């Protein structure tokens, strides 16, 4: 199984969620609502979940083994970092343009 596409949207919240992602597997299957969470030990990926009638959250879709979970986390967090670098570059370019316009 290969993750063939990652779409990520950073979010600004008061909580620990930093982004929401969708991944495409083998160009055939999409999983939406994967969350990037800023946990006590750094960033991690939380699979889409739904609150049951008992109040507990249950994953809607999740990897069967730890290798697959690690692969998904690796590509999603890499995209998170890439998007962050692009945003930082865009802000730096805007600041440079406003300084040169003065």
UniProtKB/Swiss-Prot annotation:
Keyword Cell division: yes
Keyword entries, A-Z: Cell cycle, Cell division, Septation
InterPro entries according to UniProt: SpoVG, SpoVG_sf
Pfam families, per database record: SpoVG (PF04026)
The keyword Repeat appears for this protein: no
SUPFAM superfamilies in the cross-refs: SpoVG-like
Gene Ontology BP term (one): sporulation resulting in formation of a cellular spore
Family in the record: Belongs to the SpoVG family.
Summary of the function given for this chain in its UniProt record: Could be involved in septation.
The protein, known as: Putative septation protein SpoVG 2
């Amino acid at each position: 199984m290969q993750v063939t596409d990652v779409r990520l949207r950073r979010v600004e919240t008061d909580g620990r969620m930093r982004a929401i992602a969708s991944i495409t597997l083998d160009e055939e299957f999409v999983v939406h609502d994967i969350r990037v969470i800023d946990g006590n030990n750094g960033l991690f990926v939380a699979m889409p979940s739904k609150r049951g009638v008992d109040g507990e959250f249950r994953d809607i879709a999740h990897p069967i083994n730890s290798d697959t979970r690690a692969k998904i986390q690796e590509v999603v967090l890499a995209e998170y970092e890439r998007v962050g670098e692009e945003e930082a570059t865009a802000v730096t370019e805007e600041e440079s343009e406003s300084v040169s316009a003065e």
